[in-house]
Amino acid sequence: MRNFTYKYIIIISFALIITLSSCSSWFKVENNPQVYGKYDHVPQGGGHYKVGEPYEINGKWYYPEVDNDYDQVGIASWYGDYFHGRLTANGEYYDMNALSAAHKTLPLPSYLKVTNLENNKSIVVRLNDRGPYIDDRIIDLSKKAAIELEMLNKGTAKVRVQYIEEAPLDGNQGNYFNNYKPGFLRKIWRATSSALTDL
């Protein structure tokens, strides 16, 4: 009887470990150790392409998918210092000084256009993480992205998020990030759908 109980405990413990491990992979970078410090250079890219299976967070199910026509309005927030240098959901390192973001369902990595509807400022970000899982927020931005959209101090803003295309795994942003400030975006929008230019 004692041997049976011991084996039962081992089996249950093993199953619990597997379950927790699979669940933790869906949470954001806070679950991973910090590899790079606040002032360290963080390498770009190096992750893997990921869409993912349906997953549950706090009792709510999310269904990752490729959605080339994604165009949504909602609340954006940002995450910074504490998460800097930790692995993101697709195996890249979060860099608060880069233009990146987290989204609950879109493929990783991808390029998104984010427009702050409170001041009409727009940028392109590299999507490489999952989240946010708070209220009606639809995107979590890096600290740098929040600065460029002038929402850092406020913490949140009403934004429009539009999918552009899949991003390269090597982290080479090319023309997307070389001149991300207002004015350069016209070149990008000509190569995308008319929905992206209808602001």
Identify the function of each model-found stretch.
Residues 23-199:
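Secreted/periplasmic proteins
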